[in-house]
Amino acid sequence: MKSEKSRTTSWLFQSHEVTEILGRVKKNRKKLVKGLHRAGPPPEKNYLPDSPALSPIELKQELPKYLPALQGCRSVEEFQCLNRIEEGTYGVVYRAKDKKTDEIVALKRLKMEKEKEGFPLTSIREINTILKAQHPNIVTVREIVVGSNMDKIYIVMNYVEHDLKSLMETMKQPFLPGEVKTLMIQLLSGVKHLHDNWILHRDLKTSNLLLTHAGILKVGDFGLAREYGSPLKAYTPVVVTLWYRAPELLLGAKEYSTACDMWSVGCIFGELLTQKPLFPGKSDIDQINKIFKDIGTPSEKIWPGYSELPAVKKMTFSELPYNNLRKRFGALLSDQGFDLMNKFLTYYPGRRINAEDGLKHEYFRETPLPIDPSMFPTWPAKSEQQCVKRGTSPKPPEGGLGYSQLGDDDLKETGFHLTTTNDGAVSCRPWCSLLF
């Protein structure tokens, strides 16, 4: 068994590594602010929530180990909190105003559950990834600021008015075809830039896509992002929020690459067209069920290596027809558009279209053409009014395969039922069975 120390260091960065990342943040700032600004009049009452002030003795005892790396970062008290936008798995986001410049920014408070031990790996990955991936269609990190006792850390980002998930929940009509094309071009441009820089996002979904009043799409929330290499390494398969998770991940593959992001792009494409999630599963196995019913049951012929996937070795699936997805869209999608959709949702990851080729697809060149982003209509910014609730969207994965939770379709004829057979096998009738 690993020692407590080894378990801790497996997910934490030490002070010198934090210093290196923060140095890159400061290099991107136009003006370097030296030292913490603790002097002056008391902060306004509506500054961002923070911890009570500590005495000098308590401060010495409580300061986290990464303290030296944060010297030179501004204090969060230099920002006025306007409202809380939303809370996710990896942090809380506020809309705030810089008291010095009056600029409106987004502040993401990182979740630091073990901050006295070191800097969380997910937080350092998120900062590092965004800094490496500067692009017009990716959120911009401006700087890092800290709480008054150096016990809370915030990422300062450019404020963006909407996320697509919340926006679509308030829209009375879906996006026009030309608007969908514009959004998809921007999404593919951002994803291409990530993949060109050897970065997997691993949590692409509509709630992580931001939209400015000027019609510019920004890919956000890099809490699950990581760099990848060639040859592929074994990664955890429990990534990507369930509704947007590629079939190879659902079936337990540990070696995966950019294709898992491209499946998510296909799911987003369908959601932009219909304002509804394409495959809204309630568990891993319900998600597989929904995909197979629309696209058909895969085989070794169309997906080389399929029979060797961990879940496939433990389950057998009934043959469902291929491919029923076209009727989901009707007149919303042209033949070229459906061809692109099929390329995003190709079972075999090695044949799934990449972002670069997606941008070259004929769908974006047929009428109606993509519109200029500046021609997008404007909508009231929900993030300026209240804490945004994510509705029924599932949370990002936190670990484990949810085979014990079954969705609505589980009790329908087209779903599956867990029963015990005479030979001791567990059957998921009528379309799959578990093998032991």
Curated annotation (Swiss-Prot):
Where does it reside? Cytoplasm; Nucleus membrane; Endomembrane system; Cytoplasm, Perinuclear region
Which family does the record claim for this protein?
A: Belongs to the protein kinase superfamily. CMGC Ser/Thr protein kinase family. CDC2/CDKX subfamily.
Q: What is its main location?
A: cytoplasm
UniProt binding sites for ATP: I85, E86, E87, G88, T89, Y90, G91, V92, V93, K108
The protein's name in its UniProt record: Cyclin-dependent kinase 11B
What domain of life does the UniProt record list for this protein's source? Answer: Eukaryota
Q: Coordinates of motif Nuclear localization signal in the sequence?
A: 25-30
- Phosphoserine modification sites are S123, S230, S393
User: What's the protein's topology in the membrane?
Assistant: Peripheral membrane protein
Q: Which residues form the Protein kinase domain?
A: 79-364
Q: Which residue positions does Phosphothreonine occur at?
A: T129, T236, T392
Name the UniProt key words of this record, in alphabetical order. ATP-binding, Cell cycle, Cytoplasm, Isopeptide bond, Kinase, Membrane, Nucleotide-binding, Nucleus, Phosphoprotein, Serine/threonine-protein kinase, Transferase, Ubl conjugation
Role according to the record: Plays multiple roles in cell cycle progression, cytokinesis and apoptosis. Involved in pre-mRNA splicing in a kinase activity-dependent manner. May act as a negative regulator of normal cell cycle progression.
Q: What is its EC number?
A: 2.7.11.22
Tell me what organism the protein belongs to: Rattus norvegicus (Rat)
Q: Name one GO cellular component term.
A: nucleus
Q: Which GO terms describe its molecular function?
A: ATP binding; cyclin-dependent protein serine/threonine kinase activity; protein serine kinase activity; protein serine/threonine kinase activity
List the active site: D203
Segments for region (Disordered): 383-406
Annotated spans, Calmodulin-binding: 30-44
On whether Glycosyltransferase is a keyword of this UniProt record, the answer is no
Glycyl lysine isopeptide (Lys-Gly) (interchain with G-Cter in SUMO2) cross-link site: K282
Catalyzed reactions: L-seryl-[protein] + ATP = O-phospho-L-seryl-[protein] + ADP + H(+); L-threonyl-[protein] + ATP = O-phospho-L-threonyl-[protein] + ADP + H(+)
